[in-house]
Every structure is written in structure tokens, then in C-alpha cells.
Amino acid sequence: MYKTTGLTHLINSTKYSLQGLKSAFKNETAFRHECFLACILIPLTFFLGETKIEIILMISSVLLVMALELLNSAVETVVDRIGTERHELSGRAKDQGSASVFIALCIVGIVWGGILFF
């Protein structure tokens, strides 16, 4: 298989990333919800954050949730591709992916709560 380099590699990588975002938005309800919330929360950071670092932390915490949701969706897709029958390892993989999103949501709560209330 021919491996691209340079500008061609960058263009192809960007194309594949955009395809992944489009696929997640089309197929994953949770990702659509998180995109909707990000469209509200990210602009709010410029009004609620008092310093540049607060704004950066608030935006980064929201984007972290979205990134982990993409990884969680990828894990679920691969597990479902392997087979739809119940298996302990498949369940653990899906649960752990979900737990990573939950922890990211806790981080959002800590960051936003810490900035807004302390």
C-alpha cells in the first residue's frame, strides 16, 4: 500500500477526520447532543470566563467530552462489528468507553463549577 506524505497526507488526514465527524453526527445521538451543547457553551465562555486561561479551560473541557464520545463510539462500532451476541469482554469495553465520557463530563462540571462559583 502506498503511503502518502507531506501536503497530500495532511489533506487526506483532514478528509478522513471530517468523514468521522460527519459519521458520528449522523449516527450517534449522544454526539449530536454534545455538539448542540458545545454550540451553546463555547460562546458562553467568552462572557463567563474572566481570564484567557479560564476561557481555554472551559472550552477544552467541552471539547474533551466530544473527543471521548468519538472514541467511545468507535469502540462500540468495532465491538458491534465483531458480533452482536452478548459477551463479558464486549460489555466491559463498551462500559469502559462510556465511563470515559462520564469522567469527562465530571471534568466539565469541576472546571465550569470551579470557575463560576469559586
Curated annotation (Swiss-Prot):
GO terms for cellular component: plasma membrane. Keywords: ATP-binding, Cell inner membrane, Cell membrane, Kinase, Lipid biosynthesis, Lipid metabolism, Magnesium, Membrane, Metal-binding, Nucleotide-binding, Phospholipid biosynthesis, Phospholipid metabolism, Transferase, Transmembrane, Transmembrane helix. Its cofactor is Mg(2+). It is a multi-pass membrane protein. The active site is at E69. Belongs to the bacterial diacylglycerol kinase family. This is Diacylglycerol kinase.
